[in-house]
Amino acid sequence: AAVRPGTLITDAGSTKASIVAAWERGRKKRHGRFVGSHPLAGSHRRGPEASDPELFVGRVAIVTPSTATPTEDVEAVAGLWSSLGSTVYVMNPREHDKLLAATSHAPHAIAAAVAAATPPAALPFAATGWRDTTRIAAGDAELWADILLDNAGPLATALARIATVSERILTAIEAGDRRRLVTLLKN
């Protein structure tokens, strides 16, 4: 689609490195300007009925400029999120993807794994702990597959760390090592 010369564009995607890199690769052919951003707000719900006028208030918004992004463009996009009530952080797109792999993408994958590993016969007995743990797994699987695959490297690292800790918990349980188990559960 055509963009008026000088138009400032941002996005709200869950991964940043590939989006910012794609813009930069074609930047000379485009008339607009781009600054990546990711508001950490929303839910697994979709559609107009899921709208929330306070969605960004008190939430974090991450702005992810490239090295070629003019400072005034970064400030304008940061100002947009700030005006909506968000706390704004500015960081490198790759750093964003690394941090969000640990705090968003891996938790989603783990929630889906917990939901998938729960025997159907156990579901009538699933209480708030199970529901809290698996709530985010109700998100759009097609969308989440794209997010997880787009951030595969950092996500693999985050999931490997989780697998290591899970293995330590399993080892402590199998050994009956209560002290070690308590230590692991406190982290």
Go through the PLM ranges and name each one.
Residues 2-49:
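Rossmann-like NAD(P)(H) cofactor-binding subdomain of soluble oxidoreductases
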Residues 16, 44, 69-70, 155:
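Alpha-helix N-cap/loop-to-helix initiation residues
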Residues 20, 46, 71-75, 159:
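Conserved strand-to-helix beginnings and helix N-cap segments that scaffold or border functional pockets
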Residues 26-31, 68-72, 121, 174-180:
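Short, glycine- and charge-enriched coil/turn segments that flank and shape catalytic ligand pockets
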Residues 50-55, 145-146:
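Short, flexible, solvent-exposed loop/turn segments with mixed acidic/basic and small polar residues
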Residues 53-138:
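Internal alpha-helical scaffold of NAD(P)-dependent oxidoreductase catalytic cores
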Residues 121-187:
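Interdomain hinge/lid region at the active-site interface
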